[in-house]
């Protein structure tokens, strides 16, 4: 617990100026187009809560991704000070939210150590948010303030009482700043996992309301536990080596944890003051130097180099190594604003000295583990030598082939890699269609026979001797392995995996992705790998055939068919609503139903569909008990009418004591088991609810007694819009035959070009890695040697599978 317990407006130091943020957001938060800036918004808010935890006042943080892509971050810290700031004349909370570089971390006494990726504070998040709602629980009171684009809508005000404490920030990023507002679970989970390991004992709950997924990140044991986590499902060669030292001579703190495993991949993570360095830097250089020197000294001292007649390198030492280097530096220097590379020269000396000292002691004190590590290093050197010989053999064979390219490859005429595409296709039949259907100028085709080697289980020299892998490496042209690999020699910057939509196709795609992830991850990082998306359906109507790409396009096609020659009549005598007007109404209805489906993990659709037909509830109405009671009676009447055998609904009002609101709550009793759903203030304030009530107003004024729909000569009386739409859809599908489509070989060359290869109409998925640690574990679990973790994975995820097609 911190010694200075006074945390009020006097702790908040101000460095002014916020206008520049809206003009040049990239300087403050990162790229606003590729998602990095968007996710930094969350990290800036979370870092404030982490600072509270480091000071000893916060133990729980929750992050919620809402269905409308807004975010709530809540902690149980002290709560931001609410008293009036002497310099600024407004509440300290408003200063923190509206002034750049204002906060406790600029006052040396409040936070001794603080995170912060860009160190710009939550005010930048506020400036770049369409709306931000700040809720503070402090001194048994609840305070609230709302901002639009950083502008306060009213002064901080007291809204209720509470027993808890802490800060809650709910924000919706501004579409004026960010071109794509979609939060990635993987990107958030990656950083939160790092923070929870680097800050032992703090529980961080990540919850995604879009999918229902949630995970608690809470780890004791710091970096040692982090290494053990990274090596899950791998066989460890040694116990985790770990040290943590604070140097007095230069004030640098060095913590290292490492462990070798039986895989062939190196996994090194570097941090400075809790911030990750993707490109390493001086701390990594110092670590590598000390590691290689110590191991080579040990090999020399034991006489192993002469015995095995082999020379080892630093690369051999790092095969199968998982290590984390974390340094605490008073004033770190980085190569750029994004802090991806540390350049402080004194850190190299610090890490090299401490690592050299502690690791030498480890090798001397643990002779059995030292022998196991060195044995693995010598095995790696032997495999490297075997791989070199295999490469030379491949080269000699290749010299006989024209230009050294595999005979199977149908190359393209274009020599600029940025304009060239390589289609990796499954089998010769699809390869034949693809070769005939392609654009020869820019599209090359490489058919692979059967399933390529699973590189997760194979050593490097065995992998090189595999014919299909060798063919692929030669076609790509960039080489493989540390000595040979050169991304600049890659012959295609668009590598497209095109396999059938069946089990074998999925397996081949997974084997190829395993190869790229393990051997050429840079191709994925640069966005060169794609997966082709052939159409899912073929629809026949009379003599007409049409390919349809996915379920959404199928629904659109069937809706068009249903609305042909169709009309909706408000009553018996009214003219019909048809054509574009009817299509617009159907699309609006479908949009609302899609919204309700998206919300259904939180609020069951069987309840929310009634809101279309009920009066609109405003946020102000929630404070009026009698108004809410009247609305509830109408809601209960509809629920009672919808009850089925074994299922009953009971609606009531629940008081929110913090804010003095009356919230509708429904008890669902299914076969004697009760579950409860509460519709909270955020639900009624959301754009989603607004769209439901607007559609309701439109539909409720539309249908009268005697309403009907008509298609051609056929009529159907209706009492609800849904009944009419369902009847029209059923009528529209009658004369269609629908074929679910699986194999590429089923298409002729012309169809393959039109649907899957023509750059003007095709759809492709770009392969990305947003959470490398999670990706590593998935590949290890699904493609590795251990069977038990794979069975556990399948059992725990089986129920989440949709569209299982085997």
Swiss-Prot record:
SMART domains: HATPase_c, TOP2c. It is found in: Cytoplasm. GO terms for molecular function: ATP binding; DNA binding; DNA topoisomerase type II (double strand cut, ATP-hydrolyzing) activity; metal ion binding. GO terms for cellular component: chromosome; cytoplasm. Its EC number is 5.6.2.2. Residues 420-535 form the Toprim domain. The keyword Cytoplasm applies. Keywords: ATP-binding, Cytoplasm, DNA-binding, Isomerase, Magnesium, Metal-binding, Nucleotide-binding, Topoisomerase. One of its GO terms (biological process) is DNA-templated DNA replication. It catalyses: ATP-dependent breakage, passage and rejoining of double-stranded DNA. Mg(2+) 2 binds at residues 500, 502. The record marks 451, 454 as: Interaction with DNA. Pfam families: DNA_gyraseB, DNA_gyraseB_C, GyrB_hook, GyrB_insert, HATPase_c, Toprim. Signal peptide: none annotated. Mg(2+) 1 binds at residues 426, 500. Its main location: cytoplasm. Binds two Mg(2+) per subunit. The magnesium ions form salt bridges with both the protein and the DNA. Can also accept other divalent metal cations, such as Mn(2+) or Ca(2+). Few gyrases are as efficient as E.coli at forming negative supercoils. Not all organisms have 2 type II topoisomerases; in organisms with a single type II topoisomerase this enzyme also has to decatenate newly replicated chromosomes. A type II topoisomerase that negatively supercoils closed circular double-stranded (ds) DNA in an ATP-dependent manner to modulate DNA topology and maintain chromosomes in an underwound state. Negative supercoiling favors strand separation, and DNA replication, transcription, recombination and repair, all of which involve strand separation. Also able to catalyze the interconversion of other topological isomers of dsDNA rings, including catenanes and knotted rings. Type II topoisomerases break and join 2 DNA strands simultaneously in an ATP-dependent manner. Belongs to the type II topoisomerase GyrB family. This is DNA gyrase subunit B. It comes from Pseudomonas aeruginosa (strain ATCC 15692 / DSM 22644 / CIP 104116 / JCM 14847 / LMG 12228 / 1C / PRS 101 / PAO1). The gene is gyrB.
């Amino acid at each position: 617990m911190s010694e200075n317990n006074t945390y009020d407006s006097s702790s908040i130091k101000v460095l002014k100026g916020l206008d520049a943020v809206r003009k040049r957001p990239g300087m403050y938060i990162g790229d606003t187009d590729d998602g990095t800036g968007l996710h930094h918004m969350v990290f800036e808010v979370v870092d404030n809560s982490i600072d509270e935890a480091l000071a000893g006042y916060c133990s729980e943080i929750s992050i919620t991704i809402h269905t409308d892509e807004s975010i709530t971050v809540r902690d149980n810290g002290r709560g931001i000070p609410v008293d009036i700031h002497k310099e600024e004349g407004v509440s300290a909370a408003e200063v923190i939210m509206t002034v750049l570089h204002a906060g406790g971390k600029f006052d040396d006494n409040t936070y001794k150590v603080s995170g912060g990726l860009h160190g710009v504070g939550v005010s930048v998040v506020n400036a770049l948010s369409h709306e931000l709602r700040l809720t503070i629980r402090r001194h048994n009171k609840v305070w609230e303030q709302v901002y639009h684009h950083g502008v306060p809508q009213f002064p901080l005000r007291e809204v209720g009482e509470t027993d808890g404490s802490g800060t809650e920030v709910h924000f919706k990023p501004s579409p004026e700043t960010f071109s794509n507002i979609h939060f990635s679970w993987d990107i958030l989970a990656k950083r939160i996992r790092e923070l929870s390991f680097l800050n032992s004992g703090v529980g961080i709950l990540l919850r995604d309301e879009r999918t229902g997924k949630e995970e608690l990140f809470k780890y004791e044991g710091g970096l040692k536990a982090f290494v053990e986590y990274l090596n899950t499902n791998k066989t460890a060669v040694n116990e985790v080596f770990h040290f943590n030292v604070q140097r007095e001579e230069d004030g640098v703190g060095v913590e290292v944890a490492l462990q070798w495993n039986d895989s062939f991949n190196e996994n090194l993570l570097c941090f400075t003051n809790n911030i990750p360095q993707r490109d390493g830097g001086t701390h990594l250089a110092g670590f590598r130097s000390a590691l290689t020197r110590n191991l080579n000294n040990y090999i020399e001292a034991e006489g192993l180099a002469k015995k095995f007649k082999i020379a080892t390198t630093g690369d051999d030492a790092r095969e199968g190594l998982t290590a984390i280097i974390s340094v605490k530096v008073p004033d770190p220097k980085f190569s750029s604003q994004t802090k991806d590379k540390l350049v402080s020269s004194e850190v190299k000396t610090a890490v090299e000295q401490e690592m050299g000292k502690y690791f030498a002691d480890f090798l001397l004190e643990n002779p059995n583990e030292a022998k196991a590590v060195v044995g693995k290093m010598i095995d790696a050197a032997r495999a490297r030598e075997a791989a070199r010989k295999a490469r030379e053999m491949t080269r000699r064979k290749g010299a006989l082939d024209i230009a050294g390219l595999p005979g199977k490859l149908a190359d393209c005429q274009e020599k600029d890699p940025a304009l060239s595409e390589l289609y990796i296709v499954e089998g010769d039949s699809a390869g034949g269609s693809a070769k005939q259907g392609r654009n020869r100028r820019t599209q090359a085709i490489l058919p692979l026979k059967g399933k390529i080697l699973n590189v997760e289980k194979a050593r490097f020299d065995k992998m090189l001797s595999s014919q299909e892998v060798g063919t692929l490496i030669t076609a790509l042209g960039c080489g493989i392995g540390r000595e040979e690999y050169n991304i600049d020699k890659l012959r295609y910057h668009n590598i497209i995996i095109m396999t059938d939509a069946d089990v074998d196709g999925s397996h081949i795609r997974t084997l190829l992705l395993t190869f790229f992830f393990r051997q050429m991850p840079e191709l994925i990082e640069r966005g060169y790998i794609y997966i082709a998306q052939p159409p899912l359906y073929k629809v026949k109507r009379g003599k007409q055939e049409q390919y349809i790409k996915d379920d959404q396009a199928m629904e659109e096609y069937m809706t068009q068919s249903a609305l042909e020659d169709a009309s909706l009549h408000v009553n018996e005598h009214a003219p019909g609503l048809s054509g574009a007007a009817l299509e617009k109404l159907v699309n609006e209805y479908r949009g609302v139903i899609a919204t309700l489906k998206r919300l259904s993990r939180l609020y069951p659709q069987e309840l929310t569909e009634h809101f279309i037909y009920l009066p609109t509830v405003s946020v102000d109405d929630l404070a009026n008990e009698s108004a809410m009671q009247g609305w509830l009676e109408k809601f209960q009447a509809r629920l009672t009418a919808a009850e089925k055998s074994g299922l009953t609904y009971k609606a009531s009002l629940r008081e929110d004591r913090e804010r003095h609101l009356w919230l509708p709550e429904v008890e669902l009793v299914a076969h004697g088991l009760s579950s409860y759903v509460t519709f909270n203030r955020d639900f009624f304030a959301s754009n989603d609810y607004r769209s439901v009530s607007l559609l309701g107003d439109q539909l409720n004024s539309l249908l009268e007694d005697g309403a009907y729909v008509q298609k051609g000569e056929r009529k159907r009386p209706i009492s609800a819009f849904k009944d009419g739409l369902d009847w029209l859809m059923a009528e529209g599908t009658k004369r269609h035959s629908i074929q679910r489509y699986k194999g590429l070989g089923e298409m002729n060359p012309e169809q393959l070009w039109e649907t899957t290869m023509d750059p003007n109409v095709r759809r492709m998925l770009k392969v990305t890695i947003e959470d490398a640690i999670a990706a590593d574990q998935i590949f290890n679990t699904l493609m590795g040697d251990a069977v038990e973790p794979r069975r556990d994975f399948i059992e725990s995820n089986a129920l989440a599978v949709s569209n299982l097609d085997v």
